[in-house]
């Protein structure tokens, strides 16, 4: 039905007859000549119809937005005065000689020109129209090219694309599972995988030493701008490779991807330990474009008569950190109050501050409500450590170390945006040496997952002192976003059982949930390591989209619903009976 895509026609085709198909982007009747902008996935082209062919001209005059049409015509160069540098095809146009309406379009339920006027609900309900917009189409085309590039790289490096099951067993991986009832085994349920983690480890045990899969994963969790109930991972696992080798290979892949797709050389990725990242930036995924850093000052404040500072300074689990903002002395009291409310979202009880109005005046040039609690040497040392200059402000966080890291880390990011401090376009890094466990409400939890190997200890040593052990794990971070994370896996039964015990998983529970894994670890399991990238997040960053919903063809809303298909929906009584399921209606309270 066509000879060319609309966006592919150029000056080399001048004088040629072409057949095009697509949708009417816009139609204009200007003084007896109809100008038609025809659109397909590759772009727009201008088609001109004049009254010399009255039958065709009359049909062209009836066209409206989103009619699906076929156009036949002659490519000609535009006059210099009419060249449109904003269009890929702006140097040429097509003189229409034939026109067929393939399918008419009713008046549209959403705006195609001013899509900002459409609600998120409208865009998702009529997604097939929203995806016709060039911006959306280009993102999906870009996504397809990214996955093609990733496959080529992994294929050429000996990785095998192997599918793993979608219907599997529920395992504790941090989020709630989506459950699928079994008709055959009434009362029992499959779970949709949160990741192919255990199956890819079993593939390593099966001898497939380089595996990958671009795979759908499912998590029933509260949604944010960068979360969806179903998402796509670039999943990778290797045998007989160290963490250094896995990082080197996947870094090579990511650098090649950015060079091919964006012509961006990311350079070598620096390394940073988890502890350093938390100390300097208050985050395990720091945005290195932001030059602001947290500075520890607890050692200066142990003896001050200001409990807000001295309390955390003398607490082993406390922290006092300072954040210098260049030019921040210009902040009004209201703006400082807004920052105080902001850190309160993250659990901070307040936000002390110190304005450096004129450093040449010494303490006379410094303004702060806490100045009366600090002697000259402490103030001078704070100014020195933070590198504060005239016109700066120093903000203070004092609380439990976790609260200080989270609140001041978030404030660092906000201030970096507010003061336009970001430097450079792309700043990747590896974050390594994560803690093996974290304690929540007195119980140990795996920082990554329970199959991550500790670094350099035996099972007995791990159980003797789990709190201070480091995992052989690594996260790739770009511009403050975690692109992917991975680790060396546990490859012997003794260590895996020890980790389960530390996590409070009894032997009986471990056998019930992970018996197949513990059994497999008895039969010559090779050392193995891997990593998984969030494909949706990578595409979002590379295209500059504001949400992963804008780089997925048919995403869900923030309430995990699909307005297009009205999913989820109710099952009919026959389906429920076949599954042996009874729906319990939510109890309604009635007043006595």
Swiss-Prot record:
Any GO MF annotation of the entry: ATP binding
Catalytic activity: tRNA(Asp) + L-aspartate + ATP = L-aspartyl-tRNA(Asp) + AMP + diphosphate
UniProt region (Aspartate), positions on chain: 197-200
Domain of life: Bacteria
Cellular component, GO, one term: cytoplasm
Chain positions recorded as L-aspartate binding sites: 173, 219, 448, 489
Keywords: Aminoacyl-tRNA synthetase, ATP-binding, Cytoplasm, Ligase, Nucleotide-binding, Protein biosynthesis
Subcellular localization: Cytoplasm
Keyword match Nucleotide-binding: yes
Purpose of the protein: Catalyzes the attachment of L-aspartate to tRNA(Asp) in a two-step reaction: L-aspartate is first activated by ATP to form Asp-AMP and then transferred to the acceptor end of tRNA(Asp).
Subunit record text: Homodimer.
Family membership: Belongs to the class-II aminoacyl-tRNA synthetase family. Type 1 subfamily.
Protein name: Aspartate--tRNA ligase
Native organism taxonomy: Bacteria, Pseudomonadati, Pseudomonadota, Gammaproteobacteria, Alteromonadales
